[in-house]
From Swiss-Prot:
The gene is glpK. This is Glycerol kinase. ATP binds at residues 11-13, 264, 306, 310, 407. It is an enzyme of class 2 (transferase). Pathway: Polyol metabolism; glycerol degradation via glycerol kinase pathway; sn-glycerol 3-phosphate from glycerol: step 1/1. Its EC number is 2.7.1.30. Signal peptide: none annotated. One of its GO terms (molecular function) is ATP binding. Pfam families: FGGY_C, FGGY_N. One of its GO terms (cellular component) is cytosol. It catalyses: glycerol + ATP = sn-glycerol 3-phosphate + ADP + H(+). ADP binds at residues 11, 15, 264, 306, 407, 411. Key enzyme in the regulation of glycerol uptake and metabolism. Catalyzes the phosphorylation of glycerol to yield sn-glycerol 3-phosphate. The keyword Glycoprotein does not apply.
């Protein structure tokens, strides 16, 4: 039986899963790592810690699966996107901690570029907005704030990459500096229509081309691992950013199909086939690129989903474990007019307000822990409604089904409430960790284990479906309360700036 090792490097943990050819997980390992918050709005990771943890999890997953490295036909990598690493080509050491996608330190830089009239140029080339979420201003910040970094970069001594590139560099011991089109499309430096790094954008963000990785298909030859790392030289043949990998893992291969992943953040992606320009502040991005052909997608990004539950646990100590949230929500049924707007690092799509900060509204003397926790879960659903409404407006048709995945959707109350708030059917697959599965599928395509996307689609199975059970007037009433709460948060942020 051939096996594929899938590396799933996320925002809060590094995971490795061994899959067989039928998409069944045979063994896995996962480890959380430290988050750094040196200043307000700053979020950093230790890239070397990520690499060491990832390697250890790969080794542990193989042991747990009782699979030898020689039995692996390929490795797939999926990763937190936009997070920016700058390292020394000679030593392989990072010059500074990685700047995470959630980091907002370059908000003023983005505002200045918008004020100078560059947003339309950037959007037309990249499909993205001028927002600190993306890699370009993070990279420019590192070049300008790490001593001698810009001079060394221009001399060809430094390499930039998102986490996939960083892991690939380490896995191949510096032999391969590459990324795939999905990760490149999240940097603000990549022209998604011409499928290349864009010289005008490099000039705009003051980034030297010498630091950039080679861009390849999502299923391609990305080199071979150094044998001593896993016990054998294994080809790396699939790479995709986490949300695009989930699109593949959910087998959303037809235009109009939508998936939403619920982890640290929430990310909804619709396969559009061709590029669709959003008029509702969604992102036009690369869904995947296979055999040189690009399939495009619309994406809405929510910065805080599961992270709100982590905050309730670690910041407020209202719960000890995320699994407690379902019982608490069932006890009260709803948040009872309490709204948590989790804008801890700004608001993502479709609001895109980097200055917004979190708020808890509608509190009364009767409000208790259960209502606050339930408001945290409901916020995930309301933000998802924001995204689905925007996608429907852009595409002229509203999807009737949403395929969901990620750690949060094992919560049946959340999945049902999601269906109630959105007014569409919600399908949860047998394999909810579809991000890792998508990376495995891409690696399998790259090595010839799968003949086509159609053969992958045949493996998708629904574990449970949820249908709307909330009356339309109540659905609209609750959602309007959310819209009012967000409007107040945005109004406050404008007043503060």
């Amino acid at each position: 039986m051939p096996y594929i090792l899938s590396i799933d490097q996320g925002t809060t943990s590094s995971r490795a899963i061994v899959f067989d050819a039928n998409g069944h997980a045979c063994g896995q390992a996962q480890k959380e790592f430290r988050q750094y918050f040196p200043e307000d709005g700053w979020v950093e990771h230790d890239a070397m810690e990520i690499w060491n943890d990832t390697l250890a999890m790969c080794q542990q997953a193989l042991r747990n699966a009782r699979v030898e490295a020689q039995q692996l036909v390929a490795i797939g990598i999926t990763n937190q996107r936009e997070t920016t690493v700058l390292w020394d080509r000679e030593t392989g050491d990072p010059l500074a901690r990685a700047i995470v996608w959630q980091d907002r330190r370059t908000a003023s830089t983005c505002e200045a570029l918008r004020d100078q009239g560059h947003e339309n140029q950037v959007r037309s080339k990249t499909g993205l907005l001028l927002d600190p979420y993306f890699s370009a201003t993070k990279l420019a910040w590192l070049l300008d704030n790490v001593p001698n970094a810009r001079q060394r970069a221009e001399a060809g001594e430094l390499a930039f990459g998102t986490i996939d590139s960083w892991l690939l560099w380490q896995l191949t011991r510096g032999k391969v500096h590459a990324t795939d089109a999905t990760n490149a499309s999240r940097t603000l430096l990549f022209n998604i229509h011409e499928q290349c790094w864009d010289e005008e954008l490099l000039t705009l963000f003051n980034v030297p081309a010498s630091v950039l990785p080679d861009v390849r298909d999502s299923a391609a030859d990305f080199g071979t691992t150094c044998p001593e790392l896993l016990g054998a030289a294994v080809p790396v043949t699939g790479i995709a950013g986490d949300q695009q990998a989930a699109l593949v893992g959910q087998a959303c291969f037809a235009p109009g199909m939508v998936k939403s992943t619920y982890g640290t953040g929430c990310f909804m992606v619709m396969n559009t086939g061709e590029a669709v320009e959003s008029h509702n502040r969604l992102l036009t991005t690369v869904g995947y690129r296979l055999n040189g052909k690009t399939t495009y997608a619309l994406e809405g990004s929510i910065f805080v989903a599961g992270a709100a539950i982590q905050w309730l646990r670690d910041g407020l100590h209202l719960i000890r474990d995320a699994r407690e949230t379902e019982a608490l929500a069932r006890r009260v049924g709803s948040a009872g007019g309490v709204y948590l707007v989790p804008a801890f690092t700004g608001l993502g799509a479709p609001w895109w307000d980097p200055h917004a900060r979190g708020a808890l509204m509608g509190l009364t003397r009767d409000t208790g822990i259960a209502e606050v926790v339930t408001a945290g879960l409901e916020a995930v659903c309301y933000q998802s409604r924001d995204l689905l409404d925007a996608m429907a407006a852009d595409c002229g048709t509203r999807p009737t089904t949403l395929r969901v995945d990620g750690g949060m959707v094992v919560n049946n109350w959340l999945s049902q409430t999601l269906s109630d708030v959105l007014g569409v059917c919600v399908d949860r697959p047998v394999v909810t960790e579809t991000t890792a599965l998508g990376a495995a599928y891409l690696a399998g395509l790259g090595v010839g284990l799968y003949a086509s996307l159609e053969s992958i689609a045949e493996q998708w199975r629904c574990e449970r479906g949820f249908s709307p059970a909330l009356a339309e007037p109540e659905r609209q009433k609750r959602y309007q309360g959310w819209r009012d709460a967000v409007a107040r948060v945005c109004q406050t942020s404008r007043g503060a700036n």
